[in-house]
Amino acid sequence: MNMDKCVIRMAQEKDKVRIMEIYAYARSFMAANGNPNQWKNNNPSKEVIDEDISAGNLYVIEETGTETLDGIKKGADNENSIIHGVFFFRIGEDPTYKVIERGNWLSDDVYGTIHRVAGDGQVHGVLTMAVQFCEQKIKHLRIDTHNDNKIMQHVIEKNGFKRC
């Protein structure tokens, strides 16, 4: 999969089944890799996904411009395009970050928040693409993950984030 052939766009109602598949894959991946407690009980729920889509805060990473085995082109304007990743992004105060238990924020400026990042396991660099997209919208970003999610903690730090 060529990341150059991916676009990021707002999620739409028609994407919901694929989004739920990606989150299901992410839950099983996390459980198999020492993180069985994050997103348990089928979180994020369909209701949360609906709210995120309605609010315009859910984004998908979609592969475009490829061909299937039968030679049919896939792309963002084609129903056969493939969504490989999903993430929540919103600019403005996030209730999750009203209180920081240990440490201090690096900046009190207006910020964007990234939550619920997940990929389908077929591509690498989903978080990197999400961060690059969000950085084009606002300078200051915040992100967090579950204490048991060591893989995501590593990837977050690899993308330039500092623990506060």
Regions found by a protein language model. Give the residues of each.
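Conserved acetyl-CoA-binding loop-helix of GNAT-fold acetyltransferases
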Residues: 119-136, 153-158
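Conserved active-site alpha-helix within GNAT-family acetyltransferase domains
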Residues: 148-164
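Short hydrophobic/aromatic beta-strand element in the GNAT-like acyltransferase core
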Residues: 57-60, 86, 116, 142
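Conserved GNAT acetyl-CoA-binding A-motif
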Residues: 136-148
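A short beta-loop-alpha structural element at the N-terminal edge
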Residues: 6-21
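Conserved acyl-donor/pantetheine-binding loop and adjacent beta-alpha core of acyl/acetyltransferases
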Residues: 88-122
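Conserved beta-strand in the GNAT
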Residues: 60, 81-93
